[in-house]
UniProtKB/Swiss-Prot annotation:
Lineage, broadest ranks: Eukaryota, Fungi, Dikarya, Ascomycota, Saccharomycotina
Cofactor descriptive note: Binds 4 [4Fe-4S] clusters per heterotetramer. Contains two stable clusters in the N-termini of NBP35 and two labile, bridging clusters between subunits of the NBP35-CFD1 heterotetramer.
Residues binding [4Fe-4S] cluster 1: 32, 46, 49, 55
Protein name per its UniProtKB record: Cytosolic Fe-S cluster assembly factor NBP35
Record-listed [4Fe-4S] cluster 2 binding positions: 258, 261
Database matches in PANTHER family: CYTOSOLIC FE-S CLUSTER ASSEMBLY FACTOR NUBP1 (PTHR23264:SF35), NUCLEOTIDE-BINDING PROTEIN NBP35 YEAST -RELATED (PTHR23264)
Molecular function (Gene Ontology), one example: ATP binding
One protein family per Pfam: ParA
Gene Ontology CC, one term: nucleus
Gene3D superfamilies: P-loop containing nucleotide triphosphate hydrolases
Amino acid sequence: MQTSAEMGGIIEAMPALAQDGYALEQAPPEHCPGPASENAGKGDACQGCANKDICESLPKGPDPDVALITQNLAPVRHKVLVLSGKGGVGKSTFSAMLGWALSADEALQVGVMDLDICGPSLPHMLGCVNETVHESSVGWTPVYVADNLAAMSIQFMLPEDDSAVIWRGAKKNALIKRFLKDVYWDELDYLVVDTPPGTSDEHITINTLLKESGIDGALVVTTPQEVALLDVRKELDFCRKAGIRVLGLVENMSGFVCPSCENESTIFKPTTGGGRALCEELGIKFLGAVPIDPRIGRCCDSGESFLDAYPDSPASTAIMHVVEALRDAVGDV
């Protein structure tokens, strides 16, 4: 077993990588054609770049790691990306609850992968923030939260809990590749992939590397107000351009449930109809609306399952309905 300090050494020792996974002397320029491109080292952006000679000498063609990733993830039946147009809508919280909810079915083996490299919060919400990753002959072994719920995050590799990850996109992409290629999940029914908010390098990398192994699709999280829906439209446009199937949309923080009387009131007014209206407009499946329950935050802080602690909460009921709709969307019913 390796300590957190040793694992931290592994990730700090990672070279700066270009977007296609090759070791370079410095981060690639903005309009880099990519070291695997036929134009590598020859384009206008290559002139004056410290990587020019390296890129010209590299073999061209498909990334060989894609085949290894496909082989590693072959035992995973369903891969679901959790996306959001902006931060603060509860995407990571919902990813954690999705892991808890799916693993409530003891017949399912579930994995949760935290690819929000600069803001890894899933280990805290799953109650395993102080765990470390084991490395064996078969690869990195994820941390098991329960017998049928495993998690993987860069948080397990940081030397300190509050250590910041200050990386450029290329280095983050390199770690994503290692997570997909080297984490030994064994057989899983579901792999829930929590991604950063927005549409960034990480999203492009994830989609490129997982295309061959097959992604069931994306679950998109929003809140009711128009300022969130504006960014969700951009996220949905990204999915369309990247060829990612949208499994459906979840409206989080949809009203407030009083823990005492369980009456529901509106907090974020859906000025344009909220997530449901957006789904009707764009022809997307509306997976459900989850109300605010302050106890969700307390459970996330303490690393316990809100669904187990408060099974009768309207929020718990709504989450389980979303899970049923998700399983239906991937054909698992």
